[in-house]
């Protein structure tokens, strides 16, 4: 549903009050008729501005000169294989010259994510869905800026939780394969950050506790980052922080 549409100078499309809903597959055959019609909110966007080139669309190519979301709630539901991303975004702005609808490839030139709080739930932390996954999208991001953004990652079974805050960060040459759950970053410069790492089923102990880490005042530079199939690999070139134990 859309509340209001307007033309933004010079030839951009402004849209307000956008809501995207999706039926809940697991409730379609429920004996409760009220539950059968229940829907998940995939996106609730206060305002968005769109500037897309027209001619490439005829060849299934999308050239986005500007895509700007303001005050957005998101929930990917079952769109991403064995994962769910949900939360609030203050502002998401991007330029993407090279979206191939046929090959399911996306090239993002520049992107900014600010004032966001997002949760990423992996594997069996996501309720099972009977719909086969058909999301084979691959996304390349040349330059991604993060400001005042909070991420929480829940590992399978919620055994491990990692929270990261990006006060000011710049990532270059990022690559995402949404079907494989593969996430790579070529270079990361992270300032004004913090990280909390918790093994949820291990009791905390006093002093240095490697099962419950809390790193503050973080600055980090990494030449590569890799995450796939619960495996994390990073090449850190420079890092400084303060741990809650005093380290």
Model-identified regions with their sequence ranges:
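Solvent-exposed beta-strand/coil patches in large extracellular/periplasmic or lumenal scaffold regions
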Residues: 130-159, 216-240, 244
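Short acidic, Gly/Pro-enriched loop/turn segments at secondary-structure junctions
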Residues: 56-58, 75-83, 100, 119-130, ...
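Short, surface-exposed polybasic-and-hydrophobic patches located at secondary-structure transitions
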Residues: 86-89, 93, 127-135, 158-175, ...
């Amino acid at each position: 549903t859309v509340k209001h549409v307007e033309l933004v100078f010079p030839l951009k499309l402004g849209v307000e009050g956008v809501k995207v809903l999706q039926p809940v597959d697991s409730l379609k055959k429920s004996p409760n008729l009220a539950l059968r019609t229940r829907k998940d909110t995939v996106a609730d966007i206060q305002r968005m501005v769109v500037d897309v080139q027209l001619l490439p669309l005829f060849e299934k190519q999308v050239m986005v000169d500007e895509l700007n979301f303001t005050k957005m709630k998101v929930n990917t539901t079952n769109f991403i294989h064995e994962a769910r991303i949900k939360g609030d975004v203050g502002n998401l702005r991007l330029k993407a010259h090279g979206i191939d609808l046929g090959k399911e490839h996306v090239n993002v030139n520049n992107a900014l994510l600010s004032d966001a709080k997002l949760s990423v739930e992996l594997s069996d932390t996501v309720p099972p869905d009977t719909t086969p996954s058909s999301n084979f999208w691959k996304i390349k991001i040349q330059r991604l800026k993060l400001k005042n953004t909070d991420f929480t990652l829940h590992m399978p079974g919620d055994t491990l939780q990692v929270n990261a805050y990006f006060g000011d960060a710049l990532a270059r040459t990022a690559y995402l394969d949404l079907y494989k759950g593969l996430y790579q970053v070529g270079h990361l410069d992270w300032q004004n950050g913090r990280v909390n790492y918790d093994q949820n089923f291990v009791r905390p102990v006093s002093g240095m506790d490697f099962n419950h880490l809390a790193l503050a005042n973080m600055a980090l530079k990494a030449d590569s980052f890799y995450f796939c199939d619960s495996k994390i690999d990073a090449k850190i070139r420079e890092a400084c922080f303060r741990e809650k134990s005093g380290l």
